[in-house]
């Protein structure tokens, strides 16, 4: 029987504690309500100097100053380049100079008589060799630029 009184007394204490906390939560604030914490100041900003962009350049840029119209990797090192004669007049004139851009292939260097294309490439290169002072290979006359 004593156990029953202890259970009832424990329940009454639990209800009283619950009621006490419930009343405290619903109570209106007093004359000096608590103020919220002030915001924390921002940390000091460090002004870092801007980094210069890093540009990736090919390693052989300095050694290929003559090669303006194409890369060496685009040619055929075994058979050589095709001997196409550039046009120096009209709309379709090219900036290519065969003396600077064409390369004879390895086969034409080994046996130039057996490969007709190698002889033609060598003739074309030698024909344009005198235009080496003008990098484009064009005749840079005043009429070319539209003035007389």
Swiss-Prot record:
One of its GO terms (cellular component) is host cell membrane. It is found in: Host membrane. The chain crosses the membrane at residues 1-21. Keywords: Host membrane, Membrane, Transmembrane, Transmembrane helix. It comes from the Viruses. InterPro entries: DUF5850. Residues 27-61 are annotated as: Disordered. Signal peptide: none annotated. Pfam families: DUF5850. It is a single-pass membrane protein. This is Uncharacterized protein 020R. It comes from Frog virus 3 (isolate Goorha).
């Amino acid at each position: 029987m004593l156990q029953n009184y202890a259970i009832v007394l424990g329940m009454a204490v639990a209800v009283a504690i619950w009621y006490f906390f419930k009343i405290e939560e619903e109570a209106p604030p007093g004359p000096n309500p608590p103020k919220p914490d002030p915001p924390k100041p921002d940390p000091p900003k460090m002004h870092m100097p801007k980094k210069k962009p890093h540009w990736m350049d090919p390693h052989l840029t300095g050694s290929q100053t003559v090669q303006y119209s194409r890369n060496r990797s685009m040619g055929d090192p075994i058979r050589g380049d095709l001997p196409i004669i550039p046009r120096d007049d009209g709309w379709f004139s090219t900036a290519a100079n065969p003396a600077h851009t064409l390369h004879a292939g390895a086969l034409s260097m080994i046996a130039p008589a057996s490969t007709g294309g190698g002889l033609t490439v060598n003739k074309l290169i030698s024909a344009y060799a005198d235009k080496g002072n003008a990098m484009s290979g064009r005749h840079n006359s005043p009429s070319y630029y539209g003035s007389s």
